[in-house]
Amino acid sequence: MDAIELRMGEMRRYIITMIDEHSDYVLALAVPSLNSDIVNHFFSRAARLFPVGISQIITDNGKEFLGSFDKTLQEAAIKHLWTYPYTPKMNAICERFNRALREQFIEFNEILLFEDLALFNLKLAEYLALYNSKRPEYRRASRAKPDH
């Protein structure tokens, strides 16, 4: 799980991303601000949509992954693993998805992200549906894709 920060002038937007390392199933949501409560809300909704149960989460040491989010993980008996500072390779699968998301979607919709967040999220959901079910390349051919 990770967050992407984007800026346009003084404005900031964030995209929270989450990927299952076994199936490559991904979810993401653009938000106007980022804190533990927002990440917790995203995670609570995302956990219901994931095709498999969640046993552990890997995040960086951002403050948005502490507080109510970390408490929710503890209550659900989900192991929370933190990466070491400045070591993106420890969360490489999520970081690689973030790069693909930037190159394949955000670059073409960045203005919309700052002008109409709801419409951006609608288009993001369409992109993720395609990414999760019909993308031509798979990171690992042996991985099973969810049947949706």
State where each predicted segment sits.
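Active-site beta-loop-alpha junctions of metal-dependent nucleic acid enzymes
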Residues: 11, 29-52
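Acidic/histidine-rich, metal-coordinating catalytic segments
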Residues: 34, 52-66, 141-145
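RNase H-like polynucleotidyl transferase catalytic core
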Residues: 56-61, 75-93, 109-115
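Short, well-ordered alpha-helical microsegments
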Residues: 40, 65-69
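An active-site-proximal beta-strand-loop segment
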Residues: 1-27, 33
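C-terminal domain-tail junction helix/linker
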Residues: 67, 76, 99, 103-148
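Mobile genetic element proteins and their domesticated derivatives, centered on retroelements
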Residues: 2, 18, 24, 43, ...
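Short small-residue beta-strand/loop micro-motif enriched in glycine and branched aliphatics
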Residues: 24-29, 81-83, 107-108
